[in-house]
Amino acid sequence: MRVIILAFALLLTTASVLSSATDPYLQKRQEMVRDDIRGRGIKDGRVLDAMAKIPRHLFVGERLRRQAYADTPLPIGEGQTISQPYVVALMTEALRLKPGDRVLEIGTGSGYQAAVLAEMVKDVYSIEIRKDLAETADKRLKELGYKNVAVKYGDGYLGWPEYAPFDAVIITASVNHIPPPLLKQLKEGGRLILPLGSTLFYQTLTLVTKKKGGDLAVEQMGAVAFVPMTGEAQKR
């Protein structure tokens, strides 16, 4: 473990020498990863590398950029938020992603979670029910060079059957049940993570693994607070 930590520290030091002149938020990003992500128990090196690389400040409004690397959610408009960095890392690590995976994200929001996924897997398919957010996130991701992310304006409850099955599904809005269409689009052996429970207060971060024959293994990971899933989810 000591070798891994030293190597990671060296990577950040090298990045600082090469990029500090062009990235005024580099030091804050390094501190975020060191203190709020690795410091709180995230061990997956690929998650750490992705979040050390991605300019989170470009996924929030200009007036919030100084706060972009604080371990807190921030508003992005239309009553939505960019998730707390630690929660992004926790959910991503729990999926145990592999480089060749194809991942479905429900709730594109700012596009930050999609960018983290895109650094780690082959393809990301992300659905956003709010048109303005979908278009803004799609434009931002393209400008940052992410060619392996497809953003769709639509109701994420229904998934994206044309590209199913998926190795993993991540839901970034609270819902009081596991959407059946998303379970159907999850590969056998695949993992789905979501904030499950009341859409008014706190939810339980829940990891679901689809076993052979469609059986589900469910693991509860602690309390979280997410904005509610809208659209079809509210009718159920």
From Swiss-Prot:
Matching Pfam families:
PCMT (PF01135)
What's a single GO CC term here? cytoplasm
Supply the EC number(s): 2.1.1.77
NCBIfam families, per this entry?
pimt, PRK00312.1
List the taxonomic lineage.
Bacteria, Pseudomonadati, Thermodesulfobacteriota, Desulfuromonadia, Geobacterales
- Described purpose of this protein according to its UniProt entry: Catalyzes the methyl esterification of L-isoaspartyl residues in peptides and proteins that result from spontaneous decomposition of normal L-aspartyl and L-asparaginyl residues. It plays a role in the repair and/or degradation of damaged proteins.
CDD domains from the UniProt entry: AdoMet_MTases (cd02440)
Q: Which reaction does it catalyse?
A: [protein]-L-isoaspartate + S-adenosyl-L-methionine = [protein]-L-isoaspartate alpha-methyl ester + S-adenosyl-L-homocysteine
Report a single Gene Ontology molecular function: protein-L-isoaspartate (D-aspartate) O-methyltransferase activity
Q: What is this protein called?
A: Protein-L-isoaspartate O-methyltransferase 3
Q: Where in the cell is it found?
A: Cytoplasm
Tell me the keywords, alphabetical order.
Cytoplasm, Methyltransferase, S-adenosyl-L-methionine, Transferase
Q: Give the record's family classification.
A: Belongs to the methyltransferase superfamily. L-isoaspartyl/D-aspartyl protein methyltransferase family.
Top-level taxonomic group: Bacteria
Catalytic residues, per the record, are: 83
Give GO BP annotations, semicolon-separated.
methylation; protein modification process; protein repair
Q: What is its main location?
A: cytoplasm
PANTHER family reported in the protein's UniProt record: PROTEIN-L-ISOASPARTATE O-METHYLTRANSFERASE, PROTEIN-L-ISOASPARTATE(D-ASPARTATE) O-METHYLTRANSFERASE
